[in-house]
């Protein structure tokens, strides 16, 4: 096997303008789904029952075609097909790393962006669990200097449907719904769910898309549907302080902070949002996070940059900064990407840093880099069309239009 397996699994399907305009039932709350059915003439006395049926088929059985809903009357299925969709996003490309990590490049409709947009989702299999890294925006506004995604301009927010669709598609591809099988040779947990954990650590800043992220995660953790434990869902933010308390209060998932520096002058460079919400405000918001305890610690992400933030003085500053916060500190060896000016800290220095933090009583695992060969690792996500120079991208888009609806 080569270092990177890149598999183009689909071409743009032929859509009519009418089909593109159909609203999706994915991402709607029960109340919104009921209102949508009511608007299409479903009798009031049937609404609750029909919503329960649809919820089960979409989120428990994982169907993406109304015709597969065998206990729904045929005339109801025809109405649903005519007015709604539950289709998955288009897979532009699926890449499989030599460590089993999978990265999907997904395409969604323009929705005001002027052209179809692309995002990436990453699946990381480990012993005992499988983690899906989900994107919340197309691009990012934060321009963190060490992050590849930060070099891509923000195009638009993802909808709740588009956020949830990443999870549904991953479970499809991994055989994680009833009566489904995974592709032969797929690396994943031997027992239990194939997707057991979600991290909102993909493209974008989740708290700059709070409402859609909230709706998607509440559906993902709904006990009558996808039924993920909230303790297995982690939302990562670079420090949008006003929304941190709301995240705990209204969503109730685990929190991770992209910290990366212990001094404001350095964090202003590495994570520019620090200029708006400096470290003191960020740490105070963390201390007030609802449900915070030794059993529900905040994870602080700290990318290790050679001769930038990896000294023992930085380690001492980190301990001082986090005093009084139940915390785990994830040390992340920097993942290189083309054009970056940063280097990864020497492994010996990373271990010294970790040992110092451990001796102060903080868990400080060193995150094993995953999917580096397919640019799927932390800080490397960036949609393929945005990596290209403008002329290449235009040529690529022209090819996509030319292939629109083409047969294999």
From Swiss-Prot:
Main subcellular location of this protein, as a coarse class: cytoplasm
SUPFAM superfamilies documented for this protein: Radical SAM enzymes (SSF102114)
Reactions mediated catalytically: adenosine(2503) in 23S rRNA + 2 reduced [2Fe-2S]-[ferredoxin] + 2 S-adenosyl-L-methionine = 2-methyladenosine(2503) in 23S rRNA + 5'-deoxyadenosine + L-methionine + 2 oxidized [2Fe-2S]-[ferredoxin] + S-adenosyl-L-homocysteine; adenosine(37) in tRNA + 2 reduced [2Fe-2S]-[ferredoxin] + 2 S-adenosyl-L-methionine = 2-methyladenosine(37) in tRNA + 5'-deoxyadenosine + L-methionine + 2 oxidized [2Fe-2S]-[ferredoxin] + S-adenosyl-L-homocysteine
Cysteine disulfide links: 133-378
Cellular component, GO, one term: cytoplasm
Cofactor descriptive note: Binds 1 [4Fe-4S] cluster. The cluster is coordinated with 3 cysteines and an exchangeable S-adenosyl-L-methionine.
Superkingdom classification of source: Bacteria
GO terms, biological process: rRNA base methylation; tRNA methylation
GO MF term (any one): rRNA binding
Family in the record: Belongs to the radical SAM superfamily. RlmN family.
Name of this chain's protein: Dual-specificity RNA methyltransferase RlmN
Native organism: Rhizobium leguminosarum bv. trifolii (strain WSM2304)
Gene name tied to this protein: rlmN
């Amino acid at each position: 096997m080569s270092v990177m397996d890149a598999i183009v699994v689909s071409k743009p399907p032929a859509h009519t303008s009418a089909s593109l305009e159909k609203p999706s039932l994915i991402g709607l709350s029960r109340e919104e789904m009921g209102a949508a059915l009511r608007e299409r003439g479903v009798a009031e006395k049937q609404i609750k029952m029909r919503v329960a049926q649809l919820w089960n088929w979409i989120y428990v059985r994982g169907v993406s075609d109304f015709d597969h809903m065998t206990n729904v009357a045929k005339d109801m299925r025809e109405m649903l097909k005519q007015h709604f969709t539950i289709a998955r996003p288009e897979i532009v490309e699926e890449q499989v790393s030599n460590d089993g990590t999978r990265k999907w490049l997904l395409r969604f409709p323009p929705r005001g962006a002027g052209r179809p947009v692309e995002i990436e989702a990453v699946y990381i299999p480990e012993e005992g669990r499988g983690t899906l890294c989900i994107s919340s925006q197309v691009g990012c506004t934060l321009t963190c200097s060490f992050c590849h995604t930060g070099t891509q301009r923000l195009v638009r927010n993802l909808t709740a449907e588009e956020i949830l669709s990443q999870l549904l598609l991953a479970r499809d591809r991994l055989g994680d719904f009833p009566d489904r099988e995974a592709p032969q040779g797929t690396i994943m947990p031997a027992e239990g769910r194939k997707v057991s954990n979600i991290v909102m650590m993909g493209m974008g800043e989740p708290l700059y898309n709070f409402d859609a992220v909230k709706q998607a995660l509440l559906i993902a953790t709904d006990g009558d549907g996808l039924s993920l434990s909230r303790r297995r869902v982690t939302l990562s933010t670079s420090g949008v302080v006003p929304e941190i308390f709301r995240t705990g209060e209204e969503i109730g998932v685990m929190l991770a902070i992209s910290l990366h520096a212990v001094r404001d002058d350095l964090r202003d460079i590495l994570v520019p949002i620090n200029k708006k919400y400096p470290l003191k405000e960020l740490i105070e918001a963390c201390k007030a996070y609802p449900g915070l305890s030794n059993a529900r610690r905040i994870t602080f992400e700290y990318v290790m940059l050679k001769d930038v933030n990896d000294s023992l003085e930085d380690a001492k500053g980190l301990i001082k900064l986090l005093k009084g916060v139940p915390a785990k500190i994830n040390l992340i060896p920097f993942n290189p990407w083309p054009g970056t000016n940063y280097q990864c800290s020497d492994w010996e220095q990373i271990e010294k840093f970790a040992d110092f933090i451990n001796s102060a009583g903080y868990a400080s695992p060193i995150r094993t880099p995953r999917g580096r060969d397919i640019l799927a690792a932390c800080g490397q996500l960036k949609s393929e069309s945005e990596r290209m120079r403008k002329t290449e991208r235009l040529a690529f888009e022209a090819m996509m239009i030319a292939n629109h609806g083409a047969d294999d």
